[in-house]
Amino acid sequence: MDQSSSPSQPESQAQPNLCIPCSLGTCLIHFHEFSSSSFMDPVSLFCSSPYPNLPPHSRSSSLESKKPSVASQDVKSDGTLPIGTNNNPLIPSHSQESSHWTIRHESMPSALAGSSAQSMQQFPSITQNEENFRFKKSFTQPQPIVKETTFPKSEPGQEHAKLSDLSYEEFLKKYSSTKVERVSEAAPPPSSLNSSTVLDENDSLISQGSSVDDQTDFLGFDDSLSYAYILNPTSDSDVDLIRQYFIPKEGTYTFSNMHIRYVSANPKTPVMYMVDPAYEPHKQIARYEKLQQIFQVVEATVSPEVGERLIGLYFRYIHRVYPVIHGERFLLAFKKAKHKLSPILLTAMYASSIIYWDADKELRNYPRLDAKKLWDLTEDFLDLSFSLSRLSTLQAAIIFLTGRPWINVAGNWSILTRAIALAQILGFHLDCSEWQIPKEEKILRNRVWWALFVNEKWLSMYIGINASIRQDDYLVPPLTDNQLLAGEQRIADSFNVFVKMAELSILLQNVLQHLFNARAVMTMSKNRRTVAQKISKYLISLEEFSCSCNLRENQPGSLSLFLQIDALELLLRKTALKLKLTDAVYQQEMLNVVQRCVSHFLAINESHFTDFFWPYSQFYFCILSSAIIKMYLDFEFNENFNATTFGLLSSFTKHCVWLKFRNFDLVFMAYKRLNALLIELSSGRPLIGKLLQETFEHRKRNLDETLT
């Protein structure tokens, strides 16, 4: 580990104990070891004496790794777990009998709650026996699940290529192009599924001699049932009292099974985290059992070979523009210790990659997985996981929100609001630049927050719900294009798209907050001059932002970014036209904007199908289709504009149908809505009727059939 990035040791620390919060992903005593060596879940908040009721001499000196399963009936009637027994997931057993200390289902992800050897070297008072202790979870054997799909196997004498062909840098270089290959006719199943998606064992990006335990976090069904959260000035725990009388600067304090860690470098604005024990552990145990069952379904659905290809697609098309995980750490774990990855995160990555299935020549010959089923499983995972503080839960939620296709808008909003609440509980809305945590963790925390911010603003705009993040609710500094992690130099251009999307979302926040909050909408017609001034100011800012986007035409994610710029300008122009602000000027400007938007829409072709698109584009296409139809109806009897507006409508409709029949999912909603509206407008309008006949393959007015 890079010692230069490691924070200093706390001056005072509790008696050395094995670290349950490390398993939780909320360790702040070992945060220098935990966060810099594991970025699957670097919440890195807290760790102190996890066994306050256990004498130091009674800790086992010979147990080496495995822990018995815990059943719900082991919980006492008062909701606590027995201390000093092998059934308490928070207390290590003292028994030397190890006959029942076995992992009953080796394929299930397990979690280690002990610290790595590297961290123990930094705490010399901990004995070597304690250093060797590993605290693993065991689950009862689940019922076997029959796989729903059968995948081709390798021929005898041939082996699957493992995920060790390329380094992270080489992988990004190899897949720097996003050019799509057209789907060919069905070919016979391949004899082997070649893969080149993860790090080489001698990758220079990984510190020499590092083990998997040094480089990965132990996620998933970990043993800790504690809750981590940040203390605020209005919290029931008095921050000033704790800081002044119970805990030194950058120190720790433990009382009544609760652990506090002080991380603020500025005593005037203290920042502390607390970890409370679970008050209803029997419910958490039941939750873990349900999570286990869900992941068994995932493993039965996604074979290891197909899973490798899907992860390759994720890093090839999504991670480049949307880097919300630590790619290097994840790929290393995927290669060496896949069972230690977060099941919820892995499932979300699988589901989000299916949209690019046809871009992989090998996957074309395999039965296509049901994306909806994997998204449903991800949603089930999230529903069960939001009650525990995990960064992997946040990352999975963020990936879920950008997944395609969207099916349940209300469900997505529910996931989004819970993810925002969890991020605020864990302090992701605060400026961590002065915190005593590694630089890489600071970068990742900022990325996660801005990814949530982007999703919240655009979803709020498109579905018309008031934003839940206000301008005064966060202190996170803006993203910059130089905030790259190890091995990400080759995706710097694509990362700039993410930076620009966050910047555009800040502008959108101002528009929504000042023009479209509930009170402003109700009084808009009474304050037309003020509204006109605000719209003019925002249009100037949007033009300046657009000019600052020095992006290549074929840069991954750039087309989707420009579509969102068009969407925001269209919103502002529509609002001005609705208020009849100098009609002639705004009508002409509105027509110019629609022409430019249609021009960008017509530029979408098959080479863009594997580009990264924000899923909100589907709402924008619907808004654009409605704007074109309204403009045509407004100018239906205007000789100067009638031909122009009908030409726009005809071009948009034909291209929308063309994209739909090539399975470009982002136009499905616009296709259905456009078809329904044109059917309703075709009566008495020969031009519309002819357009409908030429572009759509049916002429029935039965709306139910047109929407199938």
Curated annotation (Swiss-Prot):
Gene Ontology CC entries for this record: nucleus; vacuole
Keywords: DNA-binding, Metal-binding, Nucleus, Transcription, Transcription regulation, Vacuole, Zinc
UniProt GO molecular function: DNA-binding transcription factor activity; RNA polymerase II cis-regulatory region sequence-specific DNA binding; zinc ion binding
Main localization (coarse): other
Example of a GO biological process term: DNA-templated transcription
Top-level division of the source organism's lineage: Eukaryota
Compositional bias ranges of the Low complexity kind: 58-72
Ranges of compositional bias, category Polar residues: 83-101
Coiled coil: none
Location(s), subcellular: Vacuole; Nucleus
Feature: DNA-binding region: 24-53
Region entry Disordered, spans: 56-101, 180-200
Record protein name field: Uncharacterized transcriptional regulatory protein C105.03c
